[in-house]
């Protein structure tokens, strides 16, 4: 058996091929797993569990079917869907996890997260992240009428795209010291995350021992998952 990890699908109505690929994944590979972990940015945007977007209901039903089949499903918030709440989690049969979670998998101690907190060189983003994660601000935003939230979300995505266009790729990648610090804080030799859209398996030293950082790919033109078994940790790409 295997435990599966995915991230950065950025589901939206404008990308039906990605949605179709995810549905096939849920109906196939996911049903064979010991567990499925979604490490953030499942959706391109999330303005509240009360958004009647049919895509959200469709995805909730599809994930719930996996959960109901006996495969537990877990979710860590990303930078795009950090407002995804208990209502959607309940509808989809997912368990919400904290932003950093340590798992014991087949004899390995593995830290999982979305990965945006590791990009500490991007001071502008980290300041923005701190602001939008304030509970009072989230409560205020979610109390706004849906049409107002949609307008704000469109403006924020446009601002983010403009800001990122002027940033170097290095700034938007993880900071190595932040990676080592997180792994040593949790006493792990394995880290799995997404966010950067740069799939790879990196070797490093943490806790004065060899360690590994496995980065999930985004679902732009193909699927990406990490498959952990008793024998191996594999980064796998597959067609939609």
Curated annotation (Swiss-Prot):
Q: Which GO terms describe its cellular component?
A: cytoplasm; extrinsic component of plasma membrane
As for subcellular location, the record says: Cell inner membrane
Q: Which UniProt keywords apply?
A: Cell inner membrane, Cell membrane, Hydrolase, Lipid A biosynthesis, Lipid biosynthesis, Lipid metabolism, Manganese, Membrane, Metal-binding
Question: Entry's Pfam families?
Answer: Metallophos
Q: How does it sit in the membrane?
A: Peripheral membrane protein
Against InterPro entries, the record matches this protein to: Calcineurin-like_PHP_ApaH (IPR004843), LpxH-like (IPR043461), Metallo-depent_PP-like (IPR029052), UDP-diacylglucosamine_Hdrlase (IPR010138)
Show the SUPFAM superfamilies listed in the entry: Metallo-dependent phosphatases
- Per UniProt, substrate binds at 79-80, 122, 160, 164, 167, 195
| Enzyme Commission no | 3.6.1.54
The cofactor remark states:
Binds 2 Mn(2+) ions per subunit in a binuclear metal center.
Quick one: signal sequence residues?
Answer: none
Disulphide-bonded residues: none
Name the pathway it acts in: Glycolipid biosynthesis; lipid IV(A) biosynthesis; lipid IV(A) from (3R)-3-hydroxytetradecanoyl-[acyl-carrier-protein] and UDP-N-acetyl-alpha-D-glucosamine: step 4/6
Residues annotated for Mn(2+) 2 binding in this entry: 41, 79, 114, 195
Identify the domain of life. Answer: Bacteria
GO BP terms: namely: lipid A biosynthetic process
Q: Where does Mn(2+) 1 bind?
A: 8, 10, 41, 197
Q: Which reaction does it catalyse?
A: UDP-2-N,3-O-bis[(3R)-3-hydroxytetradecanoyl]-alpha-D-glucosamine + H2O = 2-N,3-O-bis[(3R)-3-hydroxytetradecanoyl]-alpha-D-glucosaminyl 1-phosphate + UMP + 2 H(+)
Molecular functions (GO terms): manganese ion binding; UDP-2,3-diacylglucosamine hydrolase activity
Family the UniProt entry places it in: Belongs to the LpxH family.
Role noted for this protein: Hydrolyzes the pyrophosphate bond of UDP-2,3-diacylglucosamine to yield 2,3-diacylglucosamine 1-phosphate (lipid X) and UMP by catalyzing the attack of water at the alpha-P atom. Involved in the biosynthesis of lipid A, a phosphorylated glycolipid that anchors the lipopolysaccharide to the outer membrane of the cell.
What NCBIfam families does this protein map onto? lipid_A_lpxH, PRK05340.1
Output this protein's name: UDP-2,3-diacylglucosamine hydrolase
Source organism per entry reads Escherichia coli O157:H7
Q: What is the lineage of its organism?
A: Bacteria, Pseudomonadati, Pseudomonadota, Gammaproteobacteria, Enterobacterales
């Amino acid at each position: 058996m295997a435990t599966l990890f995915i991230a950065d699908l950025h589901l939206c109505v404008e990308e039906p091929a990605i949605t179709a690929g995810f549905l096939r994944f849920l109906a196939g590979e996911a049903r064979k797993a010991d567990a499925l972990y979604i490490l953030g940015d499942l959706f391109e945007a999330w303005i509240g569990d009360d958004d009647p977007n049919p895509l959200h209901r469709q995805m909730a039903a599809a994930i719930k079917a996996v959960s109901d089949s006996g495969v537990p499903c877990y979710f860590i918030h990303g930078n795009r869907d950090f407002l995804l709440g208990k209502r959607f989690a309940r509808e989809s049969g997912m368990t919400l996890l904290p932003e950093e979670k340590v798992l014991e998998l087949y004899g390995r101690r593995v830290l999982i997260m979305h990965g945006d907190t590791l990009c500490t060189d991007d001071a502008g983003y980290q300041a923005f992240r701190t602001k939008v994660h304030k509970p009072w601000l989230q409560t205020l935003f979610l109390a706004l009428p849906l049409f107002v939230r949609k307008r704000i979300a469109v403006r924020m995505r446009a601002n983010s795209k403009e800001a990122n266009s002027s940033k170097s790729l290095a700034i938007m990648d993880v900071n190595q010291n932040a990676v080592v610090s997180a792994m040593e804080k949790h006493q792990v030799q394995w880290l799995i995350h997404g966010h950067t859209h740069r799939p790879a398996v990196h070797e490093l030293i943490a806790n004065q021992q060899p360690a590994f950082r496995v980065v999930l790919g985004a679902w732009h033109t193909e699927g990406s998952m990490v498959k952990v078994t008793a024998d191996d940790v594999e980064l796998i790409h597959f067609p939609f």
